[in-house]
């Protein structure tokens, strides 16, 4: 080989090595955004005929349908209940689940047994279909509360959780906030919770006490998810009740209080209900209340929207007292009725989220009452990301600045609103 050919050979070999090195660095340097399969969406349900319809966030119905329609192996749903009516949008979800089962996807559903026994039985539409199994979890017997979580997982990797029940009204007549995360570690953590509750449907506690927990995503082991829209997002889930959480899972209530306690500048909170009520008439639940007052006393600006369904008995006095604190502003939200007439159990802000400072966001199924943390199954995702925080800030102020919210008047006598 002459010098010229040898030199060309060396150049070609060098270029090939550089190419291999670049590919190696892309794949293994930790910069997963380029080829990342992770996805994040903040998902909103909007009551029709309201100013909230200006939101450009993905709608719950569309996100759920996409998740189910793209599922290849499994769909696991844990929800408080199903409520469908002929011609309403939940029919599309039920049809999608049937179609998924028809193409071989294994569908499992957990619903609360107590609510099912006394209320809507729309989940029965899926009974007896090949590849679909439905179980009822006796949460009242297990922990004294209800299975109040609203989450599902497609293919063990694509997770949705939030305030949305599998209720047709939660798709078009109730304000809801949820989050979809496609990430294998988050999917695995939620899937293990589902497997535990699947066993608990049969009163089998083995799943709680004998579970390997080294891979769970939690407050001490958060995951960083790469998203085209939001960039790098650090996140972890938290669950209730602690007594029925597997070892290694974070507690919702503890994380909630910690975030409030660590807040330095602001808290924007939108919550369906808030109450000091406990099982004992002599004891009031004031852990969140004390944390909010403490935050306000150190200069944190606190704004809260409660739905008008929070107006009941002593809860109203509790809210009035909180609103009298310096640095705390509270409004009640009253969604206008639908033009076609009154719809029971609808036209309400059912959201359960808040943001802290400019980076922490909380999206949950828990209302702010003791039983939701101590006795009921609920799920939350906590994120650390400025863009998600900004997204939820927009959601908050669309309600805060709307014509259907008004500041709490401590001198006014409020009456409970009609629900059904």
What are these regions (language model features)?
Residues 1-4, 30, 293:
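Intrinsic-disorder/low-complexity regions
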Residues 2-20:
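Bacterial N-terminal signal peptides that target proteins for export
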Residues 17-30:
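Bacterial N-terminal signal peptides
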Residues 32-135, 139-420:
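Charged, low-complexity intrinsically disordered terminal segments
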